[in-house]
């Protein structure tokens, strides 16, 4: 029995006041619908039917080449009509799970519980109890058993008093779903084909209907405007921050952190305020991350320190390495064990060896730097000739004086010393001292220019 997921994503989202289709608005730098797609994959879906309508080109461009079946809903005539567009790709023996592209916080564990609650040949619907259920369809029960769902505009006074509401998420047998969708009518206050009407049909056909509930109501909330989108963003961030704390991170203020990807942390990790994580970030034990740092697709080893306002992207920090404040590691950069870069040092496709240091104001690009090297302030590897990038090699225990330019390709041998202000254009041998600056001149009695009075 295959799990066939139908995701409804055809709406325009007029209240968003945007040209972007509603489901493409982001939560944690990922579109709402992509969150739903990822969750569907995580529970082992065999197929995903994406029902789309408004903004088709933008939707297809944003979602790219994914394992999706695109099912067009040319007219938005209700949720039942939307699901019906997926019928050509649904087999009789499928379990059909219906999800919504603007409900991004639904968790895999909740969907697994819903699927487990579905009886053989029966239906399972996800419900939640709200203090204020206004606007939602109500779950109608008789003697504890679900007999139907009534929408807000069609409900009588007794039904409006019901607090258990329909989330719209349900698991339905494929063959029965086809039959029930074929019976739908739009004879209601909205003039639409309600998916919810299939529940009364299931009851009338003697089909068993079970329910499940999420761990939190926020899982099933959608975003119809930017205020609700911001609320979902905060809820998502709170949930992700909680995961980090449970895993061993000490967050200085859990409400002032942004997690926009997959973060793995070790024990006793300290994270100060306003830190941003993006992509896949792996952090070891006893790591300290200062305020305002940005970590993107990087690996941080045990006991490393990232000082405030540093940007670490596509890079690695070794054991007890440190960066910052105001340092930038670009893709391909790596600090080996005990290596350090300080304020306003930038590295790209460069390795700084064990115990080596670049304390201030340097650019190290396309460079292999050995152990025990000191990089003076203002040092630049001149790696680009206007057409191609070239490699700088600095071997172990080299001392590079301040304001030195290394014009690549060039190799500096072990133990060499480069005098401050030098421009190095040729290879330097081991233990050599190289000074290329112009000889210092002393002009006695020099008279400074005097300003001319006007």
From Swiss-Prot:
Name the UniProt record assigns to this protein: Bifunctional protein GlmU
Keyword check for Iron: no
NCBIfam families: glmU (TIGR01173), PRK09451.1 (NF006986)
Region spans: Linker: 227-247
Reaction(s) this enzyme catalyzes, per UniProt: alpha-D-glucosamine 1-phosphate + acetyl-CoA = N-acetyl-alpha-D-glucosamine 1-phosphate + CoA + H(+); N-acetyl-alpha-D-glucosamine 1-phosphate + UTP + H(+) = UDP-N-acetyl-alpha-D-glucosamine + diphosphate
Annotated region (Pyrophosphorylase), positions in chain: 1-226
GO CC list: cytoplasm; membrane
């Amino acid at each position: 029995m295959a799990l066939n997921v139908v995701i409804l994503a055809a709406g325009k989202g007029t209240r968003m006041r945007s040209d972007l289709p509603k489901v493409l608005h982001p939560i944690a730098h990922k579109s709402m619908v992509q969150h739903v797609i990822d969750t569907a994959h995580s529970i082992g879906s065999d197929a995903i039917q994406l029902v789309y309508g408004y903004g088709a080109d933008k939707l297809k461009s944003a979602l790219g080449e994914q394992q999706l079946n695109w099912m067009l809903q040319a007219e938005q005539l209700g949720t039942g009509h939307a699901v019906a567009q997926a019928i050509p790709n649904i087999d009789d023996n499928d379990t059909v799970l219906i999800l919504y592209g603007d409900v991004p916080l639904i968790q895999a564990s909740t969907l697994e519980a819903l699927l487990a609650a579905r009886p053989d040949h029966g239906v399972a619907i996800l419900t939640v109890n709200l203090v204020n259920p206004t606007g939602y369809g109500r779950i109608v029960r008789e003697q504890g058993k679900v007999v139907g769902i009534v929408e807000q505009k069609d409900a009588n006074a007794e039904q409006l008093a019901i607090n258990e509401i329909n989330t719209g998420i349900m698991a339905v047998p494929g063959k029965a779903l086809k039959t029930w969708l074929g019976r739908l009518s739009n004879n209601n206050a909205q003039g639409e084909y309600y998916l919810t009407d299939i529940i009364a049909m299931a009851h009338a056909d003697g089909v068993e209907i079970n329910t499940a509930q999420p761990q939190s109501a926020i899982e099933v909330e959608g975003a119809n405007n930017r205020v609700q989108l911001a609320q979902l963003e905060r809820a998502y961030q709170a949930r992700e921050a909680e995961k980090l704390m449970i895993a061993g991170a000490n967050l200085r203020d859990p409400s002032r952190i942004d997690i926009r990807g997959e973060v793995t942390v070790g024990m006793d990790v300290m994270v100060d305020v306003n830190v941003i994580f993006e992509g896949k970030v792996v952090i070891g034990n006893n790591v300290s991350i200062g305020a305002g740092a940005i970590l993107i697709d990087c690996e941080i080893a045990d006991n490393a320190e990232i000082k405030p306002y540093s940007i670490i992207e596509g890079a690695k920090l070794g054991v007890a390495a440190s960066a910052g404040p105001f340092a930038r590691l670009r893709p391909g950069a790596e600090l080996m064990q005990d290596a350090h870069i300080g304020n306003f040092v930038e590295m790209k496709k460069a390795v700084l060896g064990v115990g080596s240091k670049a304390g201030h104001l340097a650019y190290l690009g396309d460079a292999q730097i050995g152990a025990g090297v000191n990089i003076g302030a203002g040092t630049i590897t001149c790696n680009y000739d206007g057409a191609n990038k070239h490699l700088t090699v600095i071997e172990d225990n080299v001392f590079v004086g301040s304001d030195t330019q290394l014009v690549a390709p060039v190799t500096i041998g072990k133990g060499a010393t480069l005098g401050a202000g030098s421009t190095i254009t040729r290879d330097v041998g081991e233990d050599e001292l190289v000074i290329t600056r112009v000889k210092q001149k002393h002009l006695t009695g020099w008279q400074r220019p005097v300003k001319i009075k006007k």
